[in-house]
Amino acid sequence: MTPRSRLATLGTVILLVCFCAGAAHSRGDTFQTSSSPTPPGSSSKAPTKPGEEASGPKSVDFYQFRVCSASITGELFRFNLEQTCPDTKDKYHQEGILLVYKKNIVPHIFKVRRYRKIATSVTVYRGLTESAITNKYELPRPVPLYEISHMDSTYQCFSSMKVNVNGVENTFTDRDDVNTTVFLQPVEGLTDNIQRYFSQPVIYAEPGWFPGIYRVRTTVNCEIVDMIARSAEPYNYFVTSLGDTVEVSPFCYNESSCSTTPSNKNGLSVQVVLNHTVVTYSDRGTSPTPQNRIFVETGAYTLSWASESKTTAVCPLALWKTFPRSIQTTHEDSFHFVANEITATFTAPLTPVANFTDTYSCLTSDINTTLNASKAKLASTHVPNGTVQYFHTTGGLYLVWQPMSAINLTHAQGDSGNPTSSPPPSASPMTTSASRRKRRSASTAAAGGGGSTDNLSYTQLQFAYDKLRDGINQVLEELSRAWCREQVRDNLMWYELSKINPTSVMTAIYGRPVSAKFVGDAISVTECINVDQSSVNIHKSLRTNSKDVCYARPLVTFKFLNSSNLFTGQLGARNEIILTNNQVETCKDTCEHYFITRNETLVYKDYAYLRTINTTDISTLNTFIALNLSFIQNIDFKAIELYSSAEKRLASSVFDLETMFREYNYYTHRLAGLREDLDNTIDMNKERFVRDLSEIVADLGGIGKTVVNVASSVVTLCGSLVTGFINFIKHPLGGMLMIIIVIAIILIIFMLSRRTNTIAQAPVKMIYPDVDRRAPPSGGAPTREEIKNILLGMHQLQQEERQKADDLKKSTPSVFQRTANGLRQRLRGYKPLTQSLDISPETGE
C-alpha cells in the first residue's frame, strides 16, 4: 500500500469514527426492542408440552429490562456448611395410634348476671309557650342481696332505692311516687349473648303545670343483664361482654380465695351464697335446682356467676389431631413420630412423661373415648401392643401414644381354622427384622406340625412379604442417605461458586433476577429494579472514541419508571442493565457478537449491528437428565395449622369489642329522643315559630310569602342581636365593661336620689347654699306672712316667664317652615337684608 493510499485509508477511518460518535450523540444508532415479549420459539416452533424442556427462560422476570446494582444494602444470607445426614439404618419402627394435644389458648367463657338500680334525675323547665330539659343526672348503684333473691326468683323489684352520698342518705322513688313492687320486662337487643331486663325503660320528664318554674323528675329503673364473661390464664380476673372488668378469679370459691370481708384490696365486696335459686324468665315462679353462686359488689353494680371447679371447667391442653395410623421410629436419643396425614415429624425424648394422668386429669375421659373409637376402626387389622404412653415434644406438644401390632397372616389363618378360639396374645415389641423372622419361623414350625398344605402356603407368603419389606426399606434408607449426602455436597459447591459470581448463584437459587455480593462472610442479596420497558434503546455500534478500544456489550439508554431523566448503561446478561460502561475489549479485525434480548438475538459483526434473529434458531445444550418417577406417590405438603382462626381470635383478647360497641351504640340510640330534648326545647323554638307562621299565611300567595320573609328576617335579626349581646357579655373585656357600666349607673342613681331628697327637704338652701350664713337685716327679721308673699311672688314670676317662653316658642316657625319660606322667597327673587351694626335689632333705628 502506497503512502498516499494509506493516508486516504486513515482519513476514511477517522471520518467514520467521527461520524459514529456524532451519530451516537444524536441517538441515530439506537433502536427499540418490542415491548410485548413472546415466549421463545413461538414463531418457528410448536409450543413446549408439559414435561419437556423449554428452550428459553421460564420466568417472566428474565424478559424484563432491569437494574440490579442500584441498591447498596440487602438481605443477608449464609450457607449452612455444618449440615449432617441422619443415619436411619437398623431403626425400630412401631405402628400405633397418636393423639396430639396442644396448649389451650382459648379463654374460659362462662355466664354472668349483672344487677343494678339506676336513679335518673331530670330537671324540666316550664315556660309560657315552651318546655325544656335543662339537666339530667344518672346515679347507678348495686342492688342489695335480699332484693337480688327476689329478682332472680320472680323478676320483681322495688321502685325505690336508697343512696348514700357524702354521708347523707337519700331515697329515690320512681315517678316521685310511693315504693311499690314492679315487674322486670325483657328488652330487645342486637346480640344473642346479651339479654337485658328493665323495670322502667321510659324516662320520666313531664314538666310542671305552672309557667316559669322548674321540676325535678325521678326515674328508678331496675336492671338485669345476662351476658357472658371471659377469663384468660392465669384466671385472676375476667371481662364481661359489656366491657366491665372484675379483678376476681372466676374460680375463687373453689380456690378459697374469695374475700368475705365488706371490702378487699380491690375495693370489691365478694360474697358466696350457697343454694341460691336462679330461674329463667319463661320459668319464673318455679323452683329449679339451687346452686352456689359468687356475688361481687362494686360501687355501681353487682355481678354473680355460678361457682365452678377449675379442674373441670378449664383444661390446660386441647386435642389438636388424631392419627389412627402413625409410626414411631426409635433413634439414639429420641422418638420420631410420623403420619401420612401431615408432612411433619414430632420429636420427643425417650423418657415418657410421668404422672400425666394425675396432672391432666381433665383429659382422661377424652383420651379414653378417642382411643376406643380409633381401636374400633382398626380392630380388623391391628390389636393393641402395650399400654398407653405419654411424651412431651420439643415444640411444646403432648403426645398420647398407643402402640398397635398388625394381625399377621398366621393369626388370620388360625382364626379361619378355629373361629371359636380367642385371638393369640400380642407379641412384645421387637428390635430388628432378624428377630421378627426368627420368632415367626419358630411359630411357623410349631403351626406346621399338623402337616397342612395351607400352612406352608401361608408361611411362604409371609416370608416373601418380610423379605420384600426389608429389601424395600433398605433401598429407601440408602436412597435417603445418598440424597442427603448429595445435598450437602451441592451446598458446598454452591458456596464455592458464589465466591466467583455470587449474583448468578443467588439468581439460580431464588429463581428470579437478584443482585448479590459478598459482605465479609455473608452474602447481601437485593431485588432488581424494572425500568420503563418502552424507553430502552440499544446502540447499534460497539465502537468507542478510542480506535483500539471497543465495547464488549452494547450501550443502552433507558428511563426509570415515573422518571423523565435519561440514563446510560450497558446491556448485561439476560436483559440486565449495567449502570457502568467499563466492559470493553481490544478491537479485532473480524468478530461477531450475539446478544439475547427477550425472544430475539441481536447479531453484531465487526462491532456494528447486522441483523436480528430468533433466539430459538440457536441450539441449546441439553444438560438435564430425565428421571421418570411417576410410579412413586407424591406427597403434597400442606400448611399445618396448630390453632384455628377462631381460637386465635378468642385468645387475642378477652375483650369482645364487637359486642361491646354494638350494644353500646344500640343502648345509646335508644335515648336519642331524650338527648335531642337536652339540646333543644320540647314545645316551641324559633324554627318552629317561623314554620307555623308560614303555614298560616300560605294561602295569601305572594303577600303571604313577603310577610313570612319579613317576619323571619325580623326574628332572625332580633335573635342575632340578642346572641351578639350575649356573646359580647361572655367575652372577658365585654363582661368587665358591662360590670363597670352597671356600677356607674348604680352610683348615678344613688347620687340623683340623694339630690332629690335634699331638694325635697330644703329647696331654698339647695338654690342658695349660703343662706344660713347671711346675717339678718338691721330692720329686724321678716315675718312669716312676708316670707310667704315673697315665695308666692317668686312662683308667680317663674310661671309668667315660663308662659312667655312657651308663647314665643309657639309663635316661632319651625325649622321645616323656615326652610320652606326661605326656598319660596329665593324662588321669587328675594334676598335677605344685611343689618348695620349700629342699628338696634329691636327698634330698627
From Swiss-Prot:
Gene3D superfamilies: 1.20.5.1890, 2.30.29.100, 2.30.30.1230, 6.10.250.3280. A motif (Internalization motif) lies at residues 830-833. GO terms for biological process: symbiont entry into host cell; virion attachment to host cell. Pfam families: Glycoprot_B_PH1 (PF17416), Glycoprot_B_PH2 (PF17417), Glycoprotein_B (PF00606). Residues 754-845 are intravirion. Glycans are attached at N179, N254, N275, N355, N368, N372, N385, N408, N455, N562, N599, N614, N628. Keywords: Disulfide bond, Glycoprotein, Host cell membrane, Host endosome, Host Golgi apparatus, Host membrane, Host-virus interaction, Membrane, Signal, Transmembrane, Transmembrane helix, Viral attachment to host cell, Viral envelope protein, Virion, Virus entry into host cell. It is a single-pass type I membrane protein. Residues 678-730 are annotated as: Hydrophobic membrane proximal region. Disulfide bonds join C68-C528, C85-C484, C157-C222, C315-C362, C550-C587. Residues 124-130, 208-216 are annotated as: Involved in fusion and/or binding to host membrane. One of its GO terms (cellular component) is membrane. Residues 27-732 are virion surface. The chain crosses the membrane at residues 733-753. Its main location: virion. Residues 1-26 form the signal peptide. Residues 811-822 have a biased composition (Polar residues). A proteolytic cleavage by host furin generates two subunits that remain linked by disulfide bonds. It is found in: Virion membrane; Host cell membrane; Host endosome membrane; Host Golgi apparatus membrane. Belongs to the herpesviridae glycoprotein B family. Homotrimer; disulfide-linked. Binds to heparan sulfate proteoglycans. Interacts with gH/gL heterodimer. Interacts with host ITGAV-ITGB3; this interaction mediates viral entry. Envelope glycoprotein that forms spikes at the surface of the virion envelope. Participates in viral entry through an RGD motif that binds ITGAV-ITGB3. Membrane fusion is mediated by the fusion machinery composed at least of gB and the heterodimer gH/gL. May be involved in the fusion between the virion envelope and the outer nuclear membrane during virion egress. This is Envelope glycoprotein B. It comes from Human herpesvirus 8 type P (isolate GK18) (HHV-8).
